[in-house]
Amino acid sequence: LVQMSVSDMNYKEIPEEVEFTEKIGAIAFNLYFLVCTGRGQGNTDISNAAYEEALKMLYEQQMKYKGKLMINSKCAPQYKRVVYENDPDSVYTRTYSGGCPAATHYSRISPEGNLTPCPFIEESVGNLKSRSFKDLWENAPLMIQLRDRKQLDGKCGTCEFSAMCSGCRARAFAETGNYMDPDPSCDYEPGKHGGKAITLKVEDTLGLEVEFQTQWTPEAKERLERIPSF
């Protein structure tokens, strides 16, 4: 596995780094985009123009090394939009999780037991010493808000790709103090693809809201009951 953090200084080296990844026999390449929060607030972020170009370069490499390398972006929900613009039927669009993963696919638990929606969001929604993970995940107001794409403001709220992208909520908060404001790293202007919300078939929307019921065996239920956080 090779991982690269992208910036204005090195984004043009993406093809070389992917080539290097294959050359050394690695099976995966991840391109990380800085989220300027916490200790990263004073770091130099990539410009919006370079951000978009880097995503397009990554897609080109994904096609070039298809079947040879697993190539992915991290902290760049807009990548799914770039893939869709090139190939609406891409396996990546159909099976990769939809949008910002904060409160939808992952969260963070601090050493003190505080639960936050994302490693880049510092606001705690509660502590696992007093409330279960399940309770906080399902009922904490901030977790519910972040999962509701209808609450997105500005161009993220009117974007055709809000369901599959939604922008980075940590970047929005770092910029304006509002979790639902537009992602400042994105220059895409809604309307380019007609303005109508683009949705995928339910069976193709891993990570988006799908109704299902989990069936637990009696043995599994017994084991779960012994775990305090659940």
Predicted features and spans:
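Radical SAM enzyme [4Fe-4S]-AdoMet core and its adjacent flexible, acidic
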Residues: L1-E112, T116-R131
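Generic alpha-helical secondary-structure signal
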Residues: E17, L136-N139, I227
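Residue-level marker of regulatory loop/turn positions in helix-turn-helix DNA-binding domains and
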Residues: P101, D148, W216
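Structural beta-strand/beta-sheet cores of well-ordered domains, especially the beta-sheet scaffolds
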Residues: T104-H105, P184, F212
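Flexible mid-to-C-terminal extensions adjoining Fe-S/redox cofactors in radical SAM and related proteins
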Residues: F120-E209
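Non-catalytic accessory segments flanking P-loop/AAA+ NTPase cores
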Residues: L206-F230
